[in-house]
């Protein structure tokens, strides 16, 4: 899906020497746009902190507080060090999903490259956290409780862990890309009132997919923190 926006044209020209497709360049452009927007919102919210929050500070405290509560409920106290990572991913995925509801914009999460990058971050973080917590004993997570089944369990666990980034990326990509295609069809058939319910459903889908991505990231990291049996 191509949109003749100036910043998209800029990124296409900028990335042309790398032979990146227009769809890939657009996804990169929207990704950077979202990053800049989140940074600006963060700066505005923290520019003049007050004991009694108002405006943007109040809004961001509600959002961040909600994510923090979910991290604590899912991972407990030991999940607090990983709250910044999980909150960053959750906000990025959510805003990436919602931006597609703005006419003329396309969600970067409807591009497989973006969702794969987010999934790889979760995958690497999971194992880095596990190795940092348990050292070489982290390998026991892949061996299972019965020593003579260790080779078979290791093979099965490796496949299971490698499938995680695949399922994370494909689930988010499939849902967001599918919604965009349905929305395009409805806009083509009836560009006025009919697409409105689909856009409202898009808000719900955006929140659900961001929540699922965040929840799975928490579960994977939580699993790497647990002692192997």
Swiss-Prot record:
Q: Does the keyword Transmembrane helix apply?
A: yes
Main subcellular location: membrane
Against Gene3D superfamilies, the record matches this protein to:
ATP synthase, F0 complex, subunit A
Where on the tree of life does the source sit, at the highest rank? Bacteria
SUPFAM superfamilies linked to this entry:
F1F0 ATP synthase subunit A (SSF81336)
Q: Does the keyword Transmembrane apply?
A: yes
Question: Membrane topology type, per the record?
Answer: Multi-pass membrane protein
Pfam families per record: ATP-synt_A (PF00119)
Show the GO cellular component annotation of the record.
plasma membrane; proton-transporting ATP synthase complex
Q: Name one GO biological process term.
A: proton motive force-driven plasma membrane ATP synthesis
Q: Where in the cell is it found?
A: Cell inner membrane
TM stretches of this protein: 25-45, 86-106, 111-131, 142-162, 181-201, 202-222
Gene Ontology MF term list? proton-transporting ATP synthase activity, rotational mechanism
Q: Which UniProt keywords apply?
A: ATP synthesis, Cell inner membrane, Cell membrane, CF(0), Hydrogen ion transport, Ion transport, Membrane, Transmembrane, Transmembrane helix, Transport
Main function = Key component of the proton channel; it plays a direct role in the translocation of protons across the membrane.
Q: Which family does it belong to?
A: Belongs to the ATPase A chain family.
Assembly and oligomerization: F-type ATPases have 2 components, CF(1) - the catalytic core - and CF(0) - the membrane proton channel. CF(1) has five subunits: alpha(3), beta(3), gamma(1), delta(1), epsilon(1). CF(0) has three main subunits: a(1), b(2) and c(9-12). The alpha and beta chains form an alternating ring which encloses part of the gamma chain. CF(1) is attached to CF(0) by a central stalk formed by the gamma and epsilon chains, while a peripheral stalk is formed by the delta and b chains.
- The identity of this protein, by name, is ATP synthase subunit a
Q: Which organism is it from?
A: Geobacter sulfurreducens (strain ATCC 51573 / DSM 12127 / PCA)
Lineage per the UniProt record: Bacteria, Pseudomonadati, Thermodesulfobacteriota, Desulfuromonadia, Geobacterales
């Amino acid at each position: 899906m191509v949109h003749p926006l100036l910043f998209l044209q800029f990124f296409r020209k900028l990335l042309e020497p790398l032979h990146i497709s227009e769809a890939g360049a657009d996804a990169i452009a929207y990704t950077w746009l979202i990053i800049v927007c989140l940074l600006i919102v963060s700066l505005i919210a923290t520019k003049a902190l007050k004991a009694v929050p108002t405006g943007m500070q109040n809004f961001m405290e509600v959002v961040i507080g909600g994510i923090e509560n979910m991290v604590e409920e899912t991972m407990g106290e030991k999940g607090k060090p990983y709250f910044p990572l999980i909150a960053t991913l959750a906000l990025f995925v959510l805003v990436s999903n919602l931006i597609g509801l703005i006419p003329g914009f396309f969600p970067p999460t409807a591009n497989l490259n973006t969702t794969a990058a987010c999934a790889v971050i979760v995958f690497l973080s999971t194992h880095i956290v596990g190795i940092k917590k348990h050292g070489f004993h982290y390998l026991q997570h892949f061996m299972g409780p019965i020593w003579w089944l260790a080779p078979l369990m290791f093979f099965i666990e490796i496949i299971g862990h490698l499938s995680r980034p695949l399922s994370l990326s494909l689930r988010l990509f499939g849902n967001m890309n599918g919604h965009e295609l349905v929305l395009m069809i409805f806009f083509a058939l009836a560009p006025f009132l009919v697409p409105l319910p689909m856009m409202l459903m898009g808000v719900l889908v955006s929140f659900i997919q961001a929540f699922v991505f965040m929840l799975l990231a928490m579960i994977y990291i939580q699993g790497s923190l647990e002692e192997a049996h």
